[in-house]
Each structure stands twice: as C-alpha cells, then as structure tokens.
C-alpha cells in the first residue's frame, strides 16, 4: 500500500514552487504520492505565508482541524513549513502539540530525514536555519506538469522594506549558479515545457556565479534562457524598481521570447509613504522606468502591488496613488489592506487609518484598475493573439484554454491535440476575467524557431576587443 502525502499551500508563487518540490522530493526519496484528501494521508504538510493579516491564527486554525485526524491516527505526521514556520519556530510546537516537524523555506530539502527522525521516535524536529543554496543542490530533477513551468533562480531579499517579513523569514538574497538554472530550464524544455517563469523575491537582483568564476547578471540570464531550444515564451516574477536597470530594459528590445507583460510592484504613489516604506525610490523614478520600458516595447502592459492604508496614509497620499495608477495605466494589480507584520519596523508605527477608510480606498483603487483592465481587453477585440494552450477549458472541457502574453485567459474551440503548443486565435468577445477566441491557425503554420545551433547563439553576441581577440557574451 503506497504512502500518501497531502500538502496545503498558502501564499506566493515561490510557495507553490516549494510545495511542488516537496512533493517530488518525498516521492523520489520515500515513495509518497500526493492526495487531495487529508484524511487518507500519512504525512500532512502546511506551507505557510506571513504576508496576509492574521497569518499565525490561520495556521493554528488549520492545525486544529488536522489535530482531529491525528487523534484518530497517532502515526500521522504533521509538518509546518514556509514563512510562518520560519518566523514562529518552536512557538508553533508549544501551542500545537500535534505538530511533529517545523521547517523553513530553506530547509525543505531535509524533509526526508526529518520524517525518518519522527518515525524513529523523536518527539519533534525543528529546523528553520538558512543554509543558503544547499536547498537546490538536494532537490530532485524537475518534472514538467504541462507546457508552463516555474524555475526558481534565487532566494530571499535584502531590501528590508519596513512592512515586509521576507528578509527575516527567507533570508537575504542568494542567487543560484548560472549552470544550475540553465540545466533546469533545458530539462524542462526537453519534457515539453514551452513557457518558463523565472522566480524569486527580487529576480532583478540575480547575480549568478558562472563556471569560470564570473558573475551573470539578470539581463544576461534572460537572453540565455530565451536561447534554449523549445522555450518560446519567458516571464519573471517578482522585481523591485530600484534594480530594474537599463540593461534589463534593453532585453525587451532584442528578445521577442520575453513577454510584453511585467509585474513591477510599487506599493504606493505617494513619495512620503514610499519613504516610510523604505522602498528606496520615488514615484517619478518608477514612472521613468515605465516610460523607458514602453519606448523599448510599446505594447507592454504593467501590473503592480499596492498596500492600502499604510500607517500615516492621508487622503492626499491616497490621491497620489490614484494619480500614479492613472498615469501608468496599470492593467492589473494585487492590492491589499495594510496590516502590521510582527517584527517589521512598520509594526511599531501607529496604525492610524480606520478599517472603514481602508476598505473604501481599496474598493476605489480596485474599481479603477478593473476599468483600465477592461479597456485593454476591449482593445484586443478583433485582434489575432498568439496563445499557449494549457489544457481544457475549466467551464467546458470540450473547449480549450490558453493564455495571452498579457496573461489573459482565452477559451476557444479547437482540437485537443493543440494542448501544449501555440495557436493563433481571433478575439471575438470580452468578459471580466477572460476572453473568447476563434481558432485561426496552429503551430505547424507558424514560423517558430525549431532549432538553433550554439554557434549561432554565440555569433549573435560576438564581440572583438582592441587586440582583435573575440569574446562571446550573452
């Protein structure tokens, strides 16, 4: 009888990525298969997030539900990971005796050993250390699950924004070596992945070591990943404005695989609030980045994060945020009402914006973003869009579902043999959360790159120095 594993994941794409790696790891090392039913699992793992309000209480509420399962099955192993685990550590075990394992984002690779320790009779295992890049060295080879995939290129953040727990829960910025990233992408491409999303808390801070002891920048990494056979679409998440440098913007000019969509969090349009947040930039500097991006890629669309009701946010501050939203014409946003995160500098500030005012401002902001997004969607009406077919439509399995460059879901009728490939569709209808398309052509009728020899990649970026010596740089 096979052993069963149930993982519940909250939070960001990095947590989703980590959970998929936990599943692969425990399958490879100990033969655990995933189940959606917690009641039939031998191991329950909760991958937590510190970003949302009352994150800790949410964790203990879930553990209370799982305790009843452990009461029925004393051999059940319960583990808590992620950012709340890193933040709370032993306090989780003190409050929830049913928990056997507490691990941080940087120690998930040690899960097989932790589980074995519990099975040998140890009462609790806690490891929330920061062993830097060791995590990636211990993970199994990547497994494709459809035509899109996330690839983590770095961990942590060193920006220390006043509201954010990430530097304390995931550690400071550590980049994966270049060869490791390229190998993982190539392995996924060989399994049929066509779109890769490079992942990290602050990807544009990437500085990966190369085999010859040089450093690869994020801009160089983007070009290298885009040159891998089979990868025809490239995304990345998430960036910080203060390191969104010109060399990254230049990639948008010469790398068509990089999509015309960017998520670049700004958090506020008020310079005063940005200073309080310790963001390291002003609103005008953010707008300068967007202006240069649109010069390089005129059709690029921008999404952002916004925190509403940060301590001291006045009506004028909120008006500045709304002005920035109008000036930049954001296509999408993740917007949240501020709530203090324990241990952050902002937690010491008076939370002086009323809940009612926060809710009103959030509604106003989200309404404006929705209007702007619908305007962009209507502009797509009648156009032909290239989409990557991800699978059957959620609402109608007889139809297909794909995604445009600007992350809009398109439902359309076509043969299911197109799943995993690119198709062109004509947009014929617009809805709030999706588009309707008509099939135009399949991939066999497109002029997509099929094969590119290494010599051709190198020749594209050949440089000769003053002595006539040729160097190849990405």
Swiss-Prot record:
Chain positions recorded as [4Fe-4S] cluster 1 binding sites: 12, 49, 83
Family the UniProt entry places it in: Belongs to the methylthiotransferase family. MiaB subfamily.
Cross-referenced HAMAP family: tRNA_metthiotr_MiaB (MF_01864)
Record key words, sorted: 4Fe-4S, Cytoplasm, Iron, Iron-sulfur, Metal-binding, S-adenosyl-L-methionine, Transferase, tRNA processing
GO CC entries: cytosol
Subunit organization: Monomer.
Catalytic activity: N(6)-dimethylallyladenosine(37) in tRNA + (sulfur carrier)-SH + AH2 + 2 S-adenosyl-L-methionine = 2-methylsulfanyl-N(6)-dimethylallyladenosine(37) in tRNA + (sulfur carrier)-H + 5'-deoxyadenosine + L-methionine + A + S-adenosyl-L-homocysteine + 2 H(+)
Amino acids binding [4Fe-4S] cluster 2: 157, 161, 164
Function statement: Catalyzes the methylthiolation of N6-(dimethylallyl)adenosine (i(6)A), leading to the formation of 2-methylthio-N6-(dimethylallyl)adenosine (ms(2)i(6)A) at position 37 in tRNAs that read codons beginning with uridine.
Keyword Cytoplasm: yes
Co-factor(s): [4Fe-4S] cluster
SUPFAM superfamilies listed in its UniProt record: Radical SAM enzymes
Molecular function (Gene Ontology), one example: N6-isopentenyladenosine methylthiotransferase activity
Record's protein name: tRNA-2-methylthio-N(6)-dimethylallyladenosine synthase
All copies of domain MTTase N-terminal, residue ranges: 3-120
Domain annotation TRAM: ranges: 378-441
Major subcellular location class: cytoplasm
Enzyme kind, highest EC tier: transferase
InterPro entries (alphabetical): Elp3/MiaA/NifB-like_rSAM, Methylthiotransferase, Methylthiotransferase_CS, Methylthiotransferase_N, Methylthiotransferase_N_sf, MiaB_methiolase, rSAM, rSAM_horseshoe
EC number: 2.8.4.3
Compartment(s): Cytoplasm
